[in-house]
Amino acid sequence: MSTERDSETTFDEESQPNDEVVPYSDDETEDELEDQGSTVEPEQNRVNREAEKKRETFRKDCTWQVKANDRKFHEQPHFMNTKFFCIKESKYASNAIKTYKYNGFTFLPMNLFEQFKRAANFYFLILLILQAIPQISTLAWYTTLVPLLLVLGITAIKDLVDDVARHKMDKEINNRTCEVIKDGRFKIIKWKDIQVGDVIRLKKNDFIPADILLLSSSEPNSLCYVETAELDGETNLKFKMALEITDQYLQIEDNLATFDGFIECEEPNNRLDKFTGTLFWKNQSFPLDADKILLRGCVIRNTDVCHGLVIFAGADTKIMKNSGKTRFKRTKIDYLMNYMVYTIFIVLILVSAGLAIGHAYWEAQVGNYSWYLYDGENATPSYRGFLNFWGYIIVLNTMVPISLYVSVEVIRLGQSHFINWDLQMYYAEKDTPAKARTTTLNEQLGQIHYIFSDKTGTLTQNIMTFKKCCINGTIYGDHRDASQHSHSKIELVDFSWNTFADGKLAFYDHYLIEQIQSGKEPEVRQFFFLLSICHTVMVDRIDGQINYQAASPDEGALVNAARNFGFAFLARTQNTITVSELGSERTYNVLAILDFNSDRKRMSIIVRTPEGSIRLYCKGADTVIYERLHRMNPTKQETQDALDIFASETLRTLCLCYKEIEEKEFTEWNNKFMAASVASSNRDEALDKVYEEIEKDLILLGATAIEDKLQDGVPETISKLAKADIKIWVLTGDKKETAENIGFACELLTEDTTICYGEDINSLLHTRMENQRNRGGVSAKFAPPVYEPFFPPGENRALIITGSWLNEILLEKKTKRSKILKLKFPRTEEERRMRSQSRRRLEEKKEQRQKNFVDLACECSAVICCRVTPKQKAMVVDLVKRYKKAITLAIGDGANDVNMIKTAHIGVGISGQEGMQAVMSSDYSFAQFRYLQRLLLVHGRWSYIRMCKFLRYFFYKNFAFTLVHFWYSFFNGYSAQTAYEDWFITLYNVLYSSLPVLLMGLLDQDVSDKLSLRFPGLYVVGQRDLLFNYKRFFVSLLHGVLTSMVLFFIPLGAYLQTVGQDGEAPSDYQSFAVTVASALVITVNFQIGLDTSYWTFVNAFSIFGSIALYFGIMFDFHSAGIHVLFPSAFQFTGTASNALRQPYIWLTIILTVAVCLLPVVAIRFLSMTIWPSESDKIQKHRKRLKAEEQWKRRQSVFRRGVSSRRSAYAFSHQRGYADLISSGRSIRKKRSPLDAIIADGTAEYRRTVES
């Protein structure tokens, strides 16, 4: 017979781990024994048991060993790792940090190496090498070197400045001092000399030099307060608590010097809120968790002195582990721009090859027979053609713009500053400006298709107020009519009878106060007592007043409510908690705290009363609480009805319950609890299992209801974004009914919206899968690509789905593995093949079902996913990214939104009440959801339009410049001779045409910000990629080709058979080059003037200044003086003055410019007249629209002030805090439909643009 231990063990190497999400499988128990009672081969049992013992002996989680006050212990040979060949170093890092990248010797080679890893820079380096070969190059070396040095120099200077700053910062930090036990006494040493195992002393306002275990503190109850602003951006204080035994014995220097504790813990990692370890001391073991660890970068506050043991130092600390490279996000335009550069490169190769073939043919037909062209070498025509191929690669290299990427980064940097400087996105109440935390994604803000938003703190204010409650089936908090109770009044409840009341709670139900004071219903007092004792809040006193420090607004609201109703939490230690119960102080022994996590969705505390009885108090989500209630709870239905009512009013709810525990039961359970607490591996899973054993047969007390108001401007913002064809999905931890009512409150849902729930979706997807399978044969994957809509066109549909249904629909539900012993038998090839095919079919089915779900959801006008975890939020975002190829934006304010924010193309953080984790992980941040409309509809749209105009013009001007060489090659024997002076080629992209296009990319705007917000339909140009795509690219290419033809052939025709004023023919090569170059500079600068929609003095100055700069430099470079100094570099002596004094040369230039620009002007006029865009129509009427905006102020159609609908209590998803969720039925309230409002706005917009 197999033992119980064996029956719980799986040895199948292909089995999935318990916590992994796997699809449904029909062969889940393929290798399991059918009969548990069958006799198992003894040898196999023995092998399995030995393998299990071996696996237990090897501790994967806790392999980091630290011994206090013993540096030699950490220098043992088995702690040394081989770094390079025979060079070894200790696995324990020193505490010196090194964030800089270069030093005085390595800066130049390393920086150049990093820069030449970029394809564009390496390409131009190859060109520079080719230009050094005389047989190939017809261009001077400086034509490529000067632009390349400019690009490399700017980047190198930026990198040098950054690295010098890092050097200074590292030196400053490493040279900070700290007190460390050395030779039995505290001595002051530098941070860089601290080592793992050292015992250190820290004082108030000291920075923590390493990750340390808190040993003792001068504060009562071994508390230590820290500020974690450098870790997570939060300025509110957090508390840490030492072990009672270390705090008791390690207060004086002598005891600290002789402390010889031994720690086994997890290896260094980047999880800031997780730590697992065990302290072995005095023949006892003590569990360690994150609450006992002080992390490097934090600051000691409100604590005079504390002592700690260094566990991780330097590069091993958690803050350094988190300083690695973040995932680099790139925009859609980035990818498209790279593909276009590749296209240009291919065109360059093809054109160069064609011209090289032409040169080989010309050499064979003409060159070999022309004695005056003999160069002394008897090379074959094909060899000369081969050399000329590389010559044309050099001459035409400006088709691939070297300054493109630098210019793009400059424009993005400027656009980011405009976002930072926007006062209309500044929240004065909290002094919080908008912040562009990345500079590479601005134009993508103008292409968003889907917004994924958290609810609590994002759509709502996350300022919690206790409003109602249900106790023993009775609802309290509503106004009570005088007929119901003679003493009830409508005015606010007076809490002056309570000395601990804070005077801030607005409550109207006087009957609840009477119930508390009379004590007629013990459950009422028990209800508020539970709120005062079951929490993780800390208390301190400021000017004699109690001040609570809660990690979440929810927790603070509940504890404050209990305080106002007479049950004030006063103090806590590691083992006790003191509460004032209607003026009488009582202290309870805390026996265990059963912490919160996102899977448990509840928190419990076990206390011993002064009378000696043991009780468990629990609060959490109704879904998990109701599963654990005793079957004889008489008020279950009444409380459920109350939860429904609270949910309909969008109040955040949670359930409260308790149970009596017998001494024997607790003793048995506590032994398991202590064993799980010191488990070396899988500690969290072991604790959760132990928690489940005690949290059952609970007695329901009631439910709380907390108000969380909508933020200002949320409905208006959502309406405008909807008009911009942006779909909004709300992903929240709230229950279905609460989330639905929030949807109505923020106008995401309307009364004529048809809502589909999980059952409906599952049925639709099942039908679609069957149809696809029938059409496609064996697998839906091979179904014909015919898209059929799920709903009839024109229907207003919304989708509301819970996390459990999401797993069900997407085949992501966890499967429970059987506890039957699996034996590992060899499989035949046929069995492996069948198993592989089965898995492949499951993956295909899963993939097709996911795609169908995304198609269905994207047909809906709104999607609300409720009861979802942080992992599910990220999964939903990823599904839309994967199957719709749409640009996504995720916005949230809490730690549970970080994964979603990082997954989306654009992440936006709200700096709210839940700390700064979301902000620090985001690409953009601000304080209010309503600023999102300005970020997208103004800054995003402007950035997209500017970048598109910049890229189109940049490619155009480079093609117009470069292809003149192409036309010239037909007249010079395809000899790779340039059409311009070398210095003009060098400075064209650097000085003559760079500033105007940069300013257009920074300042241009088609319509004002007010009109952009007034007409959100303008936003669709970015969503549809209308302004920059391959079609636009080839139009710009064709425009450049035609411009180059005009620039070459008109001057060529003008120079043929002409005579100057002096009777001589000026048709020399140098005069021709000056004429073409002058016409080119004027044309491309005037062209950008035609492309500019928003004129400023700066734009005008840059255009005319660039032309003036060209002529000034040209006359200087063509002067005799500079030729005398540098005769080989400046060979166009006198060309400019001689050529440009001829009137017909100016006439030629003017004619060339006119022929280039007049067709553009004509096409623009016809386009705006016959096929005007939406922005063209608005520009045409902007004066009238501006007058209307000024004189006809319309009243907003949206309600302002406090909304009657409120938010519900959502998941916290943070370890250590109770999970607060609501449940109930949705009770819709009749409202004026939003469609009418939108229709009015749309009609006005159409009337405006059509008139």
From Swiss-Prot:
UniProt entry keywords in alphabetical sequence: ATP-binding, Cell membrane, Cell projection, Endoplasmic reticulum, Golgi apparatus, Hearing, Lipid transport, Magnesium, Membrane, Metal-binding, Nucleotide-binding, Phosphoprotein, Translocase, Transmembrane, Transmembrane helix, Transport
Protein's name according to its UniProt entry: Phospholipid-transporting ATPase IC
Domain of life where this protein originates: Eukaryota
Phosphoserine: residues bearing it: S1223
Primary residence: membrane
Ranges facing Exoplasmic loop side: 143-144, 361-385, 974-982, 1054-1071, 1116-1142
Annotated Gene3D superfamilies: Calcium-transporting ATPase, cytoplasmic domain N, Calcium-transporting ATPase, cytoplasmic transduction domain A, HAD superfamily/HAD-like
Membrane topology: Multi-pass membrane protein
GO biological process per UniProt: aminophospholipid transport; apical protein localization; bile acid and bile salt transport; bile acid metabolic process; inner ear receptor cell development; negative regulation of DNA-templated transcription; organic anion transport; regulation of chloride transport
Location relative to the cell: Cell membrane; Apical cell membrane; Cell projection, Stereocilium; Endoplasmic reticulum
Cofactor annotation: Mg(2+)
A GO cellular-component term linked to this record: phospholipid-translocating ATPase complex
Cytoplasmic side: 1-121, 166-339, 407-952, 1004-1032, 1093-1094, 1164-1251
Keyword ATP-binding applies: yes
Active site: D454
Catalytic activity, as annotated: ATP + H2O + phospholipidSide 1 = ADP + phosphate + phospholipidSide 2; a 1,2-diacyl-sn-glycero-3-phosphocholine(out) + ATP + H2O = a 1,2-diacyl-sn-glycero-3-phosphocholine(in) + ADP + phosphate + H(+); a 1,2-diacyl-sn-glycero-3-phospho-L-serine(out) + ATP + H2O = a 1,2-diacyl-sn-glycero-3-phospho-L-serine(in) + ADP + phosphate + H(+)
EC number: 7.6.2.1
Source organism: Mus musculus
